[in-house]
């Protein structure tokens, strides 16, 4: 439960109940923590009110459904998407679910109580959950709730990664690593990962980056050398601070694309005095999760190794410990953590 910037607690709350005919109540069997949750705790998302249960990623079992729900039934095992969609408004009809006008969008853990609980009320259950095939585990399915569709849609697709491209990913946290993983679906010529932490750079190498470079080692010079002075075709910002966005703008070539994924809590200077003449396309976006069915099919066929993101497991009642580990990745090596209803963890959560 969020209690204002810097304040959180794991506490007893009433079990959620159906409010609308389109709702489902889902027993949470596996849940994770997102970098956005850390942004909320910093106060970067002022629309989140104190008292809100956080979390927007979960896998669980349907307990009850409203009278209008026809796509899932009690007992079904489902992925709870980070984006809720009414399915009827102008945006939903064009697949832009993140901008839903009918009461959806990013609401879980934001405007309504979220998934970091034993049970969660899922609005618009027919369009906001996905049935899971038996060959996909709870832990791997968790990666489809947010980080994989976010990196794929907002980073790779918005950046229009194409065969032969030089792609730079600034920020090698879970979202950046997911961008590295999904960028490879389009056969880029070279992937460069930029980060401050050596542990994250090593992880980027394991996830498929061809070159890794510290932010302290002149990424501009490295990219210039790799591209014959042109700059990168695509630069993906996966941090969310002014300095990294401005670095991305310096790394992209004239005519290139800068795709911002990072959640920004402070104003960023857009240097149009330099950019106006360079024909650069800059995209931003909230994930729509329109790619989730495609990614789920790939995961079921073994074409995406989503389990690589999971570094720590906890029991559901170890939420405070999980947050502490996830918030200190340079010390703990955490990428993604999973909190499991049936977990029997006695080693501090490490896999």
Task: Indicate residue ranges for each PLM-predicted region.
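Glycine-rich beta-strand-centered segment in the early N-terminal region that forms part
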Residues: 14-31, 44-93, 133-135
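C-terminal hydrophobic helical "lid"/dimerization subdomain
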Residues: 246-250, 289-351
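Rossmann-fold dehydrogenase core element
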Residues: 257-259, 269-309
